[in-house]
Swiss-Prot record:
The keyword Membrane does not apply. This is CBY1-interacting BAR domain-containing protein homolog. GO terms for cellular component: ciliary basal body; ciliary transition zone; cytoplasm; dendrite; nucleus. Its main location: cytoplasm. It is found in: Cytoplasm, Cytoskeleton, Cilium basal body. The lineage of its organism: Eukaryota, Metazoa, Ecdysozoa, Arthropoda, Hexapoda. Component of the DZIP1-Fam92-Cby complex which promotes ciliogenesis in sensory neurons and spermatocytes by acting downstream of Cep290 to initiate early ciliary membrane formation and thus transition zone (TZ) assembly. During spermatogenesis, also regulates distal elongation of the basal-body and their docking (anchoring) to the plasma membrane and as a consequence, regulates the initiation and proper elongation of axonemal microtubules. Belongs to the CIBAR family. It comes from Drosophila melanogaster.
Length: 395
């Protein structure tokens, strides 16, 4: 730009400007990287604070649901309070980092930009004064007779160059001083913030550690064993009660099964009662209750025979009163008719041969049982007989 032989002082000034420009660029690049790193730390701490809130919530939920271990419940509640307070301090630290660290570092971008612009303007002003000083020197060398005006202009140019150089020095010095002061303050603030956080956390964690140490494992385990014993006793009582009820029901069922079916007294339904009231006998047991096993077997055989005969009568459906009525002696009362027009059957088997009657008188008499048909089968056969008697057409 200028010849180094005549204006040698300009070389040193230009070197200083070059150095300060490099310093500004380095400072801006590294401080912006530090700002982004501190911002990342702040965001991570905010997530860490949210994680502490979730941890406190889960521990509190377990402490509320715990009902047996009392000391454990108290220790968990103390730990929940400690975690909650630590989360609150983390929230305060997040706000402090945002205001005192990240925002302060972000201002260095504007500082570097303004310093670079001021330095450029100062260098331009200095170059103008240097050019003017060069012109005055050339004019003085050409017109050596009248040098008073040239000397005064040259002096003014020199003063302007000195002023611009001083301004450049002030810009460079102010930038360096502010950079050093602000960086020192920012790093100190970060350290103090971390120390306060860890100091409070140490106090809280110390108290929580003492509370956790007061958990009595033995007493809690004894309470658990007592609860289990009471639960087992209640369960055993319930099972014993169920077994007792079941045994009673089974005994009653077994008693019902042990009783002979012949000794059971069947309950008459409404139809059976009507038939009995109409004159149709369902059957009567004339045997005493202390019958032997042989009599029971004979009665079972007779019941089977009567059932078979009743089935045959129902299938044929052509029996009449003359066929069914046995030959009765003359001294017997004539049979009555029921509401259906049927005659009552004889209650005992009177039809017998003389030999059988003689043997019956000689042999010990056994209680005879009436051969009774099923009431519903008797009704069916009577109905068929009445249809034939009154010539009712069948459908």
């Amino acid at each position: 730009m200028f010849r180094r032989g005549k204006l040698s002082f300009l070389n040193t000034k230009d070197d200083r400007v070059k150095i300060i420009n490099e310093r500004i660029n380095i400072t801006e690049r590294h401080l912006m990287e530090m700002c982004s790193s501190f911002a990342l730390v702040t965001r991570k701490m905010a997530k860490y604070r949210d994680s502490f809130d979730e941890l406190a919530k889960s521990v509190k939920s377990y402490a509320d649901d715990e009902e047996i271990n009392e000391s454990l419940c108290q220790g968990l509640k103390s730990f929940t309070n400690a975690v909650t307070i630590m989360g609150d301090y983390m929230d305060i630290n997040v706000h402090r980092l945002e205001h005192k660290i990240v925002n302060e570092l972000a201002q260095f971008e504007q500082l570097c930009k303004s310093t670079r612009d001021n330095l450029r303007l100062a260098v331009i002003a200095r170059d103008k004064e240097v050019l003017r000083q060069r012109q005055m020197l050339e004019l003085k060398s050409k017109f050596s007779a009248n040098n008073s005006a040239a000397d005064s202009e040259l002096f003014k140019a020199k003063m302007e160059v000195q002023r611009t150089n001083k301004e450049i020095d002030d810009i460079i010095g102010n930038f360096e001083q502010r950079k050093l002061r602000d960086l020192k303050q920012i790093i100190s603030d970060f350290i103090l913030i971390a120390m306060k956080q860890h100091t409070k956390a140490l106090e809280i964690l110390s108290a929580s550690y003492y509370d956790i140490g007061t958990i009595d494992e033995r007493d809690d385990f004894i309470e658990f064993q007592k609860l289990m014993k009471t639960k087992e006793e209640l369960a055993s009582r319930k099972t014993a009660l169920k077994k007792g009820l079941r045994s009673q029901s089974m005994d009653s069922l077994e008693h019902e099964h042990l009783v002979s079916p012949l000794k059971r007294r069947p309950k008459l339904s409404r139809s059976n009662r009507n038939l009995t009231g109409a004159g149709i006998n369902h059957g009567s047991k004339t045997e005493p209750e202390d019958e032997t096993d042989e009599q029971d077997e004979e009665e079972d055989d007779e019941d089977e025979e009567t059932e078979q005969s009743g089935e045959e009568d129902e299938e044929s459906g052509t029996a009449t009163d003359d066929e069914r009525e046995p030959t009765q002696p003359g001294n017997q009362v004539p049979p009555r008719e029921n509401v259906f027009g049927a005659k009552i059957r004889s209650a005992s088997k009177d039809i017998a041969t003389p030999s059988t009657s003689a043997s019956a008188t000689s042999a010990p008499s056994k209680p005879s049982r009436q051969t009774v048909k099923h009431p519903f089968k008797a009704v069916a056969s009577t109905h068929v007989r009445l249809q034939k008697q009154f010539h009712v057409p069948q459908h």
